Amino acid sequence: MCDRIGCTHFPKLSEMDFSGATASSRRGFLKRAAATGTIAFGMGGGLFGGAAHAGAPVKSTHGTGFCNLNIFLAHSRQYAAKDGTELVFINTPTFAEQVTFLGMGQVDVGLMPYTSFMALYDAGAPVKIVAGGGVEGCAIVARPGIDSAEKLKGKTLGTFQLDTLEVMPYDYLKKNGISFKDVKVRYMANTPEAVEAFKAGALDWICTIEPYASALVNDVKGATMLTNGVDLYGKGYTDCVLAARSSLIKDNPAGLKSIIKAMMQAQYDAETQTEAVLKELVGKYYKTSLENAKIAQGKQPAVVDARSQTDFILQRVDSVMEMGYIKKKPGRDAIDWTLLEEVIKENPDLYGKLKFKSA
């Protein structure tokens, strides 16, 4: 889909080995990853590595927005350790590897946009959605003077390929009678790069996530938020989900349940100790100011129990199909809430205290 300026192409999922066989050899994986345009980058605490904790490891990739807050806090505080599981982050240089690492078996779970998951699933990767990440919080922000969809024609959009942040501009333009072909698209490598490009004037409009959307409106004088997605998708729309490899679900359900429980505890802490949580995560996991994080707080809440969003997730893939990323709609078997429901049943007190949930 690139005419497209400085395009970071998403790897061809159809050419990848999803068996997990590459996971046993780091060196072998790196050779294969280089051939498909993926490169490994770091491991451990925060976004830049750190000390490990006791317990059997569950390896995970992650994104950068507030929809990742529950897994960030679960990692920072290693809540799953008391249940014998260590949450280990495998960090990546670009958005593409956040997705492909899960498909190729380099990680066990990933917090990712549901659109990216659907592409993996469509390509045959043995993965399932097992829990929610966050809701709402995606936004389109335009530079000063661009205050309507009509003014976006011919302008340069900064986004990420095969992401909800690409699908939202597509849907926004379509709603306003404008073709995606009528704009220029620049696929970015990561959120910090996209944010800085917008600030520097290299992008006319950007689709990004909280806390960065609110930060741009706050930091770039005259910038306009054209939509926060609610007018397109309705209140409480899903952005990111927790996806897991089928092998983890089968071979280590207890470990996966401990991660889901840890994310649930993190959600409760974020809802009840908001300022303390932001102080802990800003800088270490979020590259923005505490002031901007406070402004954005609440615009993309963490929601582990995403069962009420099942139909939304399955129906929103229409746009992904129109864009040519998947060949057929996924069935209901792409989503497995079984372990989430077991965690809810086994932890009624914790679940009962959560502000955001399906029940």
What are the roles of these predicted feature ranges?
Residues 54-190, 194-197, 204-210, 225-227, ...:
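Short, glycine-/small- and polar/acidic-enriched structural segments
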Residues 321-359:
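Conserved C-terminal helix/tail region of periplasmic/extracytoplasmic solute-binding proteins
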Residues 31-35:
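Sec-dependent signal peptide recognition
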Residues 48-54:
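Sec/Tat signal peptide C-region and signal peptidase I cleavage site
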Residues 115-116, 192-284:
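Pocket-lining segment of extracytoplasmic ligand-binding domains
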Residues 78, 82, 230-235, 301-310:
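Short, solvent-exposed loop/beta-turn-alpha elements that line the ligand-binding surface or hinge
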